[in-house]
Swiss-Prot record:
Gene Ontology CC annotations of this record: cytosol
A GO MF label: ATP binding
Residue numbers binding ATP: 11-13, 264, 307, 311, 408
Identification of the protein by name: Glycerol kinase
Similarity remark: Belongs to the FGGY kinase family.
InterPro entries linked to this entry: ATPase_NBD, Carb_kinase_FGGY, Carb_kinase_FGGY_CS, FGGY_C, FGGY_N, Glycerol_kin
Length: 495
């Protein structure tokens, strides 16, 4: 039997899962990750804690499965994207805590660049919007604020990387300073047209070229683990950012195929093929590159508040005792009776990108109940997903035929039925909803030569299919009501 080890380093936890090449889960281990909030709007992780926790997960997962490390055909790495790490090249010691993708400390810098009229140039080269979300401004901040860091970086003594790069460096015993093309595309320093680090962007953010990792395809081979670190020299065979890995794990290999990951927030990603789609309000990014094949691009939508809207009903309003109760409460009424909830509790993402939007509850009458509000919260997740997908369809010129879903909230049958009704296409929930981890393992399988995409596509198994049951006229009427409420929320804090 061939074994594949998936390393899934996320925002709140580190995980290692051992799979058979068939996709069967043999063992999984996870550890929570401490969040550090040194100032309002700042979010940091201790890079050394990430490494030590991940290493412990790897050892425990292999031991739990009862196999020797040398039996692992390949390791796949997937990770929280954009999170920025700097470390000393010679010792591998972190030189600052990792600045997490959620961190907003560089908002002034990105606003200043927008005011200089540079967003169109950045968008054209990277597919991204000028926002603190991405790595470039975080790295620029570190170089300017950490004593002596810029000087040392210019001397070649400092490495920069996203979390995948940091883990590969440590796993290889300092031999591999690499990243994959999907993670590189999220730094705002990588040109997704030329597929190279962009010299003009490096000058704009004042980044020394020598601190950047070498970029490789997503299953191109990334060296081996050190035997001292992992107990054997195991090939590091596949790497992708978390959302790209989830798209791969869902078997979305053809242009127009899409997945939505429903968690605290939600991410919607559509495969746009070898063509780079560009559209208002959606991000253009690299999905992956397989050996001997052209780069595959993707369109991405970010929804800031999804499951967190349900959490707010529980913690903020006390309408439910636990998030698990929301489905039954929402199902106790046949519709939301005209109630809409725009959960812009921290602004709105795709396609509005308005940090000044604030939450709106509208359409209340004397007959409105907490059940109507619970249903409106589920509808809000589905409406936001609909808005993102419509923007993607416009950008790609491809009409969505079905939506594959994963993440914690994908267990909510009512949410998925509402989603199918509002989209007007089937929503498919797979048996395995750990698509991110599975996608990394599949990439490792390709890199190690034990899998191909046809074998992976054949492994995808359906748990349940949700067919749309709503008439088109009603769907469009409800969406018009949603858009009316969104307009109320936009710019609320600024205006």
């Amino acid at each position: 039997m061939e074994y594949l080890l998936s390393i899934d380093q996320g925002t709140t936890s580190s995980r290692a899962t051992l799979y058979a090449a068939s996709g069967e889960t043999l063992a999984t281990v996870s550890r929570p990750l401490v969040q550090h909030y040194p100032n309002p709007g700042w979010v940091e992780h201790a890079a050394q804690e990430i490494w030590e926790g991940q290493l412990a997960c790897i050892a425990e997962a292999i031991a739990k499965a009862g196999i020797a490390p040398a039996k692992v055909a390949g390791i796949g790495i997937t990770n929280q994207r954009e999170t920025t790490v700097v470390w000393e090249r010679e010792t591998g010691e972190p030189l600052h805590r990792a600045i997490v993708w959620q961190d907003r400390r560089t908002a002034e810098l990105t606003e200043s660049l927008k005011e200089q009229g540079l967003e169109a140039m950045v968008r054209e080269r990277t597919g991204l919007l000028l926002d603190p979300y991405f790595s470039a401004s975080k790295l620029s901040w570190l170089l300017d604020r950490v004593d002596g860091l810029r000087r040392r970086a210019e001397r070649g003594e400092v490495c920069f990387g996203t979390i995948d790069s940091w883990l590969m460096f440590k796993l290889s015993g300092g031999k591999s300073h690499l990243t994959d093309i999907s993670n590189a595309s999220r730094t705002m320093l990588f040109n997704i047209n030329t597929l190279e680090w962009d010299e003009e962007l490096l000058r704009l953010f004042r980044i020394p070229r020598g601190m950047l990792p070498e970029v490789r395809g997503s299953a191109a081979g990334f060296g081996h683990t050190s035997a001292q670190v992992a107990g054997a020299e195991i090939p590091i065979a596949g790497v992708a950012g978390d959302q790209q890995a989830a798209l791969f794990g869902q078997g979305c290999f053809a242009p127009g195929m899409a997945k939505a990951t429903f968690g605290t927030g939600a991410f919607v990603v559509m495969n746009s093929g070898a063509r780079l789609g560009v559209g208002d309000g959606v991000l253009s990014t690299i999905a992956w590159q397989l050996p001997g094949e052209a780069v595959q691009y993707a369109l991405e939508g970010s929804i800031f508040i999804a499951g967190a809207a349900v959490q707010w009903l529980q913690e903020g309003l006390g309408l439910i005792a636990s998030a698990r109760e929301v489905e039954a409460l929402a199902a106790s009424v046949s519709d939301s009776a005209g109630v809409y909830f725009v959960p812009a509790l921290s602004g709105l993402g795709t396609p509005y990108w308005d940090p000044y939007a604030r939450g709106v509850i509208a359409g209340l009458t004397r007959g409105s109940t907490k059940a109507h509000l619970a249903r409106a919260a589920l509808e809000a997740i589905a409406f936001q997903t609909l808005d993102a997908i419509r923007a993607m369809e416009k950008a790609s010129g491809i009409a969505l035929k079905e939506l594959r879903v994963d993440g914690g909230a994908a267990a909510d049958n009512l949410l998925l039925q509402i989603q199918a009704d509002l989209l007007g296409v089937p929503v498919l929930r797979p048996r395995c909803t750990e698509s991110t981890s599975l996608g990394a393992a599949f990439l490792a399988g390709i890199g190690a030569g034990v899998l191909d995409t046809s074998a992976i596509a054949a492994q995808w198994a359906l748990d349940r299919r949700f067919e749309p049951q709503m008439e088109r006229n009603l769907r469009e009427e409800l969406h018009r009501g949603w858009q009316k409420c969104v307009r109320l929320s936009l710019g609320w804090e600024k205006n």
